[in-house]
Structures are given as structure tokens and as C-alpha cells.
């Protein structure tokens, strides 16, 4: 069990569509264990009262997941130019994004490709993270990166109707 602090991510604005976008440039998976994130300082309410009595919008976080393409391989290049083979790579055609708020924890199943935690709002969110790690790098975490990324549209920030869509 560890504690993880996630600071708000900056969204990219697409002016001609009048939308905000988060660019997913990395997915990771933990092939042999689940990973659970539980927010510990986030209200389940959309708005809360701050220490000075002011009303403030609570941040939320994105849950971005993709299943594996079981039984397939993909060739990729590492940052230092080496060619590697990714076994059971992410199925990007089935990638999904969800909005989660305080009062909601998320558990990624063993082997589920997911984006690192993405907080949207004005302040950091602290999470308790539960995950078994054996200390063998490639068994604990595997990553794939994308040059241009995958765009997730985020709309309705600060409202009960916050949405994330591809």
C-alpha cells in the first residue's frame, strides 16, 4: 500500500470545436496484479465549502482503460531506439474513458491497460494505492507510449454532467 499525490493536468483546447482535450500518450498495465486507487481527500459532492466559507468546485479524475489484444504482438521502439515486441498490446479501438469523483475508488484488473491517473480541477488529489509488487520491473509494470496520443474530450467541468469521450 502506498500514497500517491496526483496534481491537476492541463487540458488542450481545440478552438474550432470549443472543447477541452486530454491527450493520452502512455498506457500501462500490471500483468499479474490488480491496482486500486482510493481518493482520500475528495468529496463526493460536485461543490464543497472551503476553509474560508467559499464554495469551490471539487476536482474529478479520469479513468481511461483498454483491454488487451490477446494472442497478438506489436513491434515498437524504445526511447533509445531499440526494437521491442509487446505481447498482448492494448486494443486502442476499444479504449474507454470515464469520469470518477470523490466517493468512488477504481480497481484496474490484472493486465488491464490504463492511463496514469488524470486529475482535472484546481487542486491535487491524494490516493491510497493498493497493489502487490514483487520488484521485477517487467512483471510489476509494462508501458506503451504513443507519439501523437489519443484525444479524450472532457466537457462539463465542474458540473454533475462532466463527461469524457473519445
Residue spans of the language-model regions?
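Non-catalytic, conserved peripheral segments adjacent to functional cores
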Residues: 1-97, 136-139, 145, 157-166
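A short pocket-lining beta-strand/turn micro-motif at the edge of beta-sheets
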Residues: 59-61, 96, 104, 123-126
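Conserved metal-binding segment of the jelly-roll/cupin
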Residues: 99-116
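A short beta-strand-loop micro-motif that forms or neighbors metal/cofactor-
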Residues: 112-144
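Glycine-rich loops and low-complexity Gly/Arg-rich segments
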Residues: 132-134, 152-157
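Short, Lys/Arg-rich amphipathic alpha-helical interaction segments
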Residues: 144-152
Amino acid at each position: 500500500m502506498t500514497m500517491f499525490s496526483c496534481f491537476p493536468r492541463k487540458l488542450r483546447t481545440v478552438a474550432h470545436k470549443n472543447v477541452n482535450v486530454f491527450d493520452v500518450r502512455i498506457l500501462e498495465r500490471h500483468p499479474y496484479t490488480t491496482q486500486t486507487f482510493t481518493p482520500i481527500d475528495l468529496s463526493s459532492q460536485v461543490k464543497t465549502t472551503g476553509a474560508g466559507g467559499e464554495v469551490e468546485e471539487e476536482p474529478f479524475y479520469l479513468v481511461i482503460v483498454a483491454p488487451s489484444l490477446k494472442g497478438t504482438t506489436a513491434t515498437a521502439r524504445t526511447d533509445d531506439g531499440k526494437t521491442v515486441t509487446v505481447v498482448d498490446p492494448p486494443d486502442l479501438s476499444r479504449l474507454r474513458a470515464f469520469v470518477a469523483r470523490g466517493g468512488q475508488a477504481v480497481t484496474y484488473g490484472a493486465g488491464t491497460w490504463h492511463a496514469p491517473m488524470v486529475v482535472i480541477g484546481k487542486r491535487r488529489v491524494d490516493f491510497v494505492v493498493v497493489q502487490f509488487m514483487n520488484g521485477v520491473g517487467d512483471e510489476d509494470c509494462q508501458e506503451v507510449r504513443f507519439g501523437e496520443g489519443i484525444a479524450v474530450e472532457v466537457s462539463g467541468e465542474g458540473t454533475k454532467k462532466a463527461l469524457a469521450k473519445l
